[in-house]
């Protein structure tokens, strides 16, 4: 009875671990048998497993035996003689189940992943192991590749700079390693290809994401973008860079730090309009100027040097707020980067046009099965379940965790806090205990460094400015008397090994100088200490002037301190303070989750359209005969034409035959005249139009030959689809920027976005049909050899578009108006664009 009651009160994670333990016991029971096998017999198990899968055995049924094979192979094939611990077996099972395994630092996530990778690779569909950078992809493919190759599986790696041929070969391997960037960009590049041989990626079957929280949460708002140079607008950014410093905060503009937004006041707007010599900044013709002004305001008021970005070698480089690293090759979106370049006095690059884009959220959800591993995921489990359908299972450590996490120490001012941190570091240094101090940005790390220099304490500083020394600095961080000051760079993916005699001193002591918005980032910093059962300790020093408490904390804290009469230098330890910190972090985490969820809701609409376009493109690219495709397109176009000029809703006497003849003349159709449509009903006219178009197609094909015709159609169709899709992406961006203001009119912005984007998409697909048929019929063939150059991908600029959660959030009080359209005509009125069509069949589609 007591056991039954205990089972009721067990948490879900404990119950899950008990289920996993049964499978682990089964794997362990097979170990003696596996040890008796020769290398050849062990390797032959791969062939045997594949045959059993063909006969109908499931991967779940194979799992215990396959995992036992991998464990034995690891001991025989690696120089380290790796043997998977039971907790690593548990992690491997969780990954196979398409869940997230939370495994603490130093617990061997990389080795644990070899188990489900091998098992799932047996299907022959390929497995992708996704890391956060090229270095880890290359290292892990070589390191863990020893195990796979020993068992007869092929291993590939995708790295930046590889040729399409090299990439294709890597994807054809049983196991493919690569960074999240490379996998995402290959998907986009494949959907810009003009030759089937240039498509490299293949099917998306099963992926394991290392540091899954970094990829799916921290970078969820960071779309992958392939872009090219657009119009020249750099002079306007320089113009605003001269105007904004003359504006006064509070009088001319207001800044909302909590929501990271800025907007002009009425007085500021009048001042700017006077300097620009325009009457209304928010007129339609000044839309671009208004947008650039807004970005320039953000650059000057919200974006901070040495926190959000650094200037290095005459370039503005983004600093990742979660990792503290430089984000090479990435640029802030929507002109913000250009505004910062103007602010910092470096060369202002041209803005760009988007050719293709996708978010990590939608890219990785395309996999049949997705799993992930990280040291910090439990705090974000709700998001993983709701967005990705992935549960989080917390895997116990192989050895008990003995790190001591001390209570936070709170000060009234930032100055007092850093003074106390410096004194704490001095005490630890005198004792000989190594210390790692985490700061939130470069500026704070340099401030603390100056304080330690004044105390005569030797130390190392690790931040985005000297990231090339990272390996050397981290290598020494666990030695006696070592003091390391680091931004979040040391918070993830680093393994600090303790030097001789350090365990006796208490291990590595970690000091956090500020609470991050996310508890995960704090936990990552703590996790640098106490790895694999080592001793260690951690403590956070915070102040009421820190951004988290200042912007999201309760005002009651300051009132409490005033009543209790605390001095600035006096540390505070109070349950109310601790609770307030926790509430503030949870509040911000929930808020950021809602932002990511909203972005995904909008992106899902775009994603459906992307899937339709890319599927159409894929069919064209791989088709051997496109005549049927063109015939289907002709029928759809004829239906559009009939609805426009010969509507069934009007009497035949009112049909616009003249307009029809004029429109058809643009297509170079053969033998067409007004007599063809006299005294005929709609169906007869429809049949006649299809017949004429078909005859035109056949004559064109006879003139240039079937093979050349197929080549012509393929290149023409792909080029027209790409051009219209690019324009559509720009139009959707403009719609998205202005749609939030619909809320002021008591209309749901998301619903409005759905309807308008649907109309825009239908209009684009109709334009694609029209342009393909019109261009196909109008092309004059000078020679039998048709040579249409595709878009030159080499000229495209591959970059990451960084949507900063600090600078691209929707404005609370926006002054810029949404995209203004003229009074909307009736659906049956002539379209105001002058095409001669009805509005519903032209711009109203």
From Swiss-Prot:
Assembly and oligomerization: Monomer and homodimer. Part of the essential Sec protein translocation apparatus which comprises SecA, SecYEG and auxiliary proteins SecDF. Other proteins may also be involved.
Entry membrane topology: Peripheral membrane protein
Gene: secA
Organism: Halothermothrix orenii (strain H 168 / OCM 544 / DSM 9562)
Phylogenetic classification of the source organism: Bacteria, Bacillati, Bacillota, Clostridia, Halanaerobiales
Cofactor: Zn(2+)
SMART domains assigned to the protein according to its UniProt record, in alphabetical order: SecA_DEAD, SecA_PP_bind
Catalytic activity: ATP + H2O + cellular proteinSide 1 = ADP + phosphate + cellular proteinSide 2
One record GO biological process: protein transport by the Sec complex
Residue positions binding ATP: 88, 106-110, 495
Family named by the database record: Belongs to the SecA family.
Name of the molecule in the record: Protein translocase subunit SecA
């Amino acid at each position: 009875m007591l056991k039954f009651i205990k089972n009721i009160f067990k948490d879900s994670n404990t119950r899950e671990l008990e289920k996993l333990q049964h499978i682990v016991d089964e794997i362990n029971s097979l170990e003696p048998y596996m040890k008796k096998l020769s290398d050849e017999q062990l390797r032959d198990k791969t062939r045997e497993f594949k045959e059993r899968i063909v006969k109908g055995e499931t991967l779940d049924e194979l799992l215990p035996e396959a995992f036992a094979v991998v464990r034995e192979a690891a001991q025989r094939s690696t120089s380290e003689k790796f043997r998977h611990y039971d907790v690593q077996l548990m992690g491997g099972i969780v990954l196979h189940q398409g869940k997230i395994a939370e495994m603490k630092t130093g617990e061997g996530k990389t080795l644990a992943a070899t188990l489900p990778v091998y098992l799932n690779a047996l299907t022959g569909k390929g497995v992708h192991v996704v890391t956060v950078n090229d270095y880890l992809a290359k290292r892990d493919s070589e390191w863990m590749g020893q195990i796979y190759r020993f068992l007869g599986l092929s291993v590939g790696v995708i790295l930046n700079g590889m040729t399409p041929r090299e990439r294709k070969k890597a994807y054809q391997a049983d196991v493919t390693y690569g960074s999240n960037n490379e996998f995402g960009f290959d998907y986009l590049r494949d959907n810009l290809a003009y030759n089937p041989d240039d498509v490299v990626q293949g099917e998306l079957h099963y992926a394991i994401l290392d540091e899954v929280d970094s990829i799916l949460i921290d970078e969820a708002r960071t779309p992958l973008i392939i872009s090219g140079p657009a119009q020249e607008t750099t002079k306007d950014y320089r113009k605003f860079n001269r105007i904004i410093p003359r504006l006064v905060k509070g009088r001319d503009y207001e800044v909302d730090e909590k929501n990271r937004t800025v907007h002009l006041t009425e007085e500021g707007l009048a001042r700017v309009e006077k300097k620009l010599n325009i009457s209304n900044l928010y007129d339609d013709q000044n839309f671009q100027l208004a947008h650039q002004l807004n970005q320039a305001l953000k650059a000057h008021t919200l974006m901070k040097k040495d926190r959000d970005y650094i200037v290095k070698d005459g370039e503005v480089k983004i600093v990742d707020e979660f990792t503290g690293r430089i984000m090479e090759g990435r640029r802030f979106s929507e002109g913000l980067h250009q505004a910062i370049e103007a602010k910092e006095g470096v060369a202002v690059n041209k803005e760009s046009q988007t050719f293709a884009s996708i978010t990590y959220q939608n890219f990785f959800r395309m996999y049949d099965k997705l799993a992930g591993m990280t040291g910090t995921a439990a705090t974000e489990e709700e998001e993983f379940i709701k967005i990705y359908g992935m549960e989080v299972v917390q895997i116990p450590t192989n050895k008990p965790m003995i790190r001591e996490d001390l209570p936070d120490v709170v000060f009234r001012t930032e100055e007092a806090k850093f003074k106390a941190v410096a004194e704490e570091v001095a005490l630890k240094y005198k004792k000989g205990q190594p210390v790692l101090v985490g700061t939130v940005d470069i500026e704070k790390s340099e401030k603390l460094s100056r304080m330690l220099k004044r105390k005569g304490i030797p130390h190392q500083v690790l931040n985005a400015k000297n990231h090339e020394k990272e390996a050397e600095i981290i290598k020494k961080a666990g030695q006696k008397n070592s003091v390391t000051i680091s931004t979040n760079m040391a918070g993830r993916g680093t393994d600090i090994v303790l030097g001789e005699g350090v365990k006796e001193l208490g291990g590595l002591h970690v000091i956090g100088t500020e609470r991050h918005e996310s508890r995960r980032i704090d936990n990552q910093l703590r996790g640098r200490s106490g790895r694999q059962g080592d001793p260690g300790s951690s403590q956070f020093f915070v102040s009421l002037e820190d951004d988290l408490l200042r912007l999201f904390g309760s005002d009651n804290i300051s009132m409490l301190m005033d009543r209790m009469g605390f001095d600035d230098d006096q540390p505070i330890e109070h349950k109310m303070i601790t609770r307030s910190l926790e509430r503030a972090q949870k509040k911000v985490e929930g808020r950021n989750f809602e932002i990511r969820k909203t972005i995904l809701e909008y992106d899902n609409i775009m994603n459906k359209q992307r899937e339709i376009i890319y599927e159409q493109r894929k069919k064209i690219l791989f088709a051997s005969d496109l005549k049927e495709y063109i015939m289907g397109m002709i029928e759809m176009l004829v239906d559009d034409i009939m609805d426009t000029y010969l509507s069934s809703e009007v009497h035949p006497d009112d049909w616009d035959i003249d307009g029809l003849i004029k429109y058809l003349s643009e297509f170079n159709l053969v033998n067409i005249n007004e007599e063809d449509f006299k005294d005929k009903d709609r169906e007869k006219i429809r049949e006649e139009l299809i017949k004429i178009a078909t005859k035109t197609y056949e004559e064109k094909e006879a003139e240039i030959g079937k093979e050349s015709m197929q080549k012509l159609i393929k290149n023409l169709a792909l080029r027209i689809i790409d051009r219209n899709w690019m324009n559509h992406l720009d139009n959707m961006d403009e719609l998205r920027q202005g749609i939030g203001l619909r809320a002021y009119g008591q209309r749901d912005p998301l619903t409005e976005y759905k309807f308008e984007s649907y109309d825009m998409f239908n209009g684009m697909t109709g334009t694609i049909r029209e342009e393909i048929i019109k261009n196909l019929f109008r092309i004059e063939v000078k020679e039998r050899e048709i040579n249409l150059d595709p878009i030159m991908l080499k000229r495209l600029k591959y970059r990451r578009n960084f949507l900063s959660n600090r600078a691209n959030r929707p404005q609370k009080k926006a002054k810029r108006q949404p995209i203004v359209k003229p009074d909307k005509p009736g659906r049956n009125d002539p379209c105001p664009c002058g095409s001669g069509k009805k509005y519903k069949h032209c711009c109203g589609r």
